[in-house]
């Protein structure tokens, strides 16, 4: 039967599969498909893990549990992008994705061990309830701020390395240091 643990492990498997496809993609189209699979899995995983983090602690500790969980995302961004750049510069871009697969496997094992088994998936949500979310101005503003904030950060990461190396002539090792400082 499906419970939150089964769902989390399955989604982590999809994340790993997407990154494996990206690592060994023979064409740009398959690389994009792998990236889309991994990103969808990541978004779903973060959403569900937020709820699980809140549910496995006492009510007065929920905010701290969620904050701790998002600290992991922040650390992954601060360390992961420069580390991926470093791996790509000293090997090739494929190895950056292989490294993500290894981290994903560690996450899958940790999820299998640490997430409690008896956490059922909550009841079904009707579409009218979901539609109400998109009519709430405060929620919409929070969603837009989050999307544009993270989108802007990752867009900057996309162009930062080529600009630093091409325009400003920084060495690859200096770019890694700059990315760590930016993160």
Explain the meaning of each model-derived region.
Residues 1-26:
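Conserved MFS/SLC helix-loop-helix module at the cytosolic interface between two early adjacent transmembrane helices
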Residues 12, 16-19, 34-35, 101-108:
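A generic transmembrane-helix signature of 12-TM secondary carrier transporters
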Residues 13, 36, 67-75, 79, ...:
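Transmembrane alpha-helical cores of Major Facilitator Superfamily
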Residues 26-30, 59-61, 68-113:
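Helix-loop-helix hairpin linking two adjacent transmembrane segments in secondary transporters
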Residues 28, 34-72:
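Cytoplasmic helix-loop-helix junction between adjacent transmembrane helices
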Residues 115-143:
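Juxtamembrane intracellular "pre-TM" segments in multi-pass secondary transporters
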Residues 140-179:
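Extracytoplasmic gate region of multi-pass secondary transporters
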């Amino acid at each position: 039967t499906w419970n939150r643990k089964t769902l989390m492990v399955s989604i982590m498997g999809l994340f790993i599969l997407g990154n494996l496809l990206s690592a060994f993609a023979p064409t740009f189209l398959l690389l994009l498909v792998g990236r889309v699979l991994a990103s969808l899995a990541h978004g779903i995983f973060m959403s569900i893990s937020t709820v699980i983090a809140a549910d496995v602690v006492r009510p007065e500790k929920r905010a701290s549990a969620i904050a701790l969980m998002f600290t992991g995302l922040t650390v992954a961004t601060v360390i992961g992008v420069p580390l991926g750049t470093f791996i790509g510069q000293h090997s090739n871009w494929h190895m950056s994705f292989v490294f993500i697969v290894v981290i994903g496997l560690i996450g899958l094992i940790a999820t299998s061990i640490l997430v409690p088994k008896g956490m059922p998936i909550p009841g079904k949500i009707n579409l009218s309830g979901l539609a109400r979310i998109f009519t709430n101005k405060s929620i919409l503003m929070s969603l837009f701020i989050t999307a544009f904030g993270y989108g802007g950060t990752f867009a900057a990461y996309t162009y930062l390395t080529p600009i630093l190396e091409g325009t400003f002539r920084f060495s690859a090792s200096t770019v890694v240091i700059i990315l760590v400082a930016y993160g």
